[in-house]
């Protein structure tokens, strides 16, 4: 099981940091998904799977749109990645990474 409050704190911090950047469509998509996950994580039966989807989404959208996660943003994303590892090996094959509707 993951620490929901700590995870929400990381999501909140990453959201606030990204909102300080130029508001490109990709940044707005990522922050929208961060907000959806933040609101939904308390009621999830397996929140680590949701975090796994979130991290994959951020990496794929970031890569496709040449968004660089440096400094604290990189640290926060790595922390979320560490949390997402608790989802197990097969969770990454169960979703279309770029589809916002999975959140």
Question: What do the predicted segments below correspond to?
Answer:
Residues 42-77:
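Short, charged early-sequence alpha-helical segments and their helix-coil boundaries
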Residues 8, 31, 35-38, 55-58, ...:
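Generic structural concept
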Residues 17, 21, 37-44, 60-64, ...:
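Surface-exposed polar/charged interaction patches
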Residues 1-35, 81, 93-103:
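Short terminal alpha-helical segments
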Residues 65-103:
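Amphipathic alpha-helical binding modules
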């Amino acid at each position: 099981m993951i620490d929901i409050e700590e995870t929400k704190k990381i999501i909140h911090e990453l959201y606030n940091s990204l909102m300080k950047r130029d508001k490109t469509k990709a940044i707005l998509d990522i922050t929208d998904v961060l907000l959806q996950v933040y609101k939904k994580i308390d009621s999830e039966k397996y929140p680590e799977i949701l975090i796994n989807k979130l991290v994959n989404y951020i990496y794929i959208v970031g890569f496709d749109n040449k968004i660089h996660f440096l400094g604290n943003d990189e640290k926060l994303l790595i922390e979320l990645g560490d949390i997402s590892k608790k989802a197990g090996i097969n969770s990454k094959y169960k979703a279309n990474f770029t589809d916002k509707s999975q959140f």
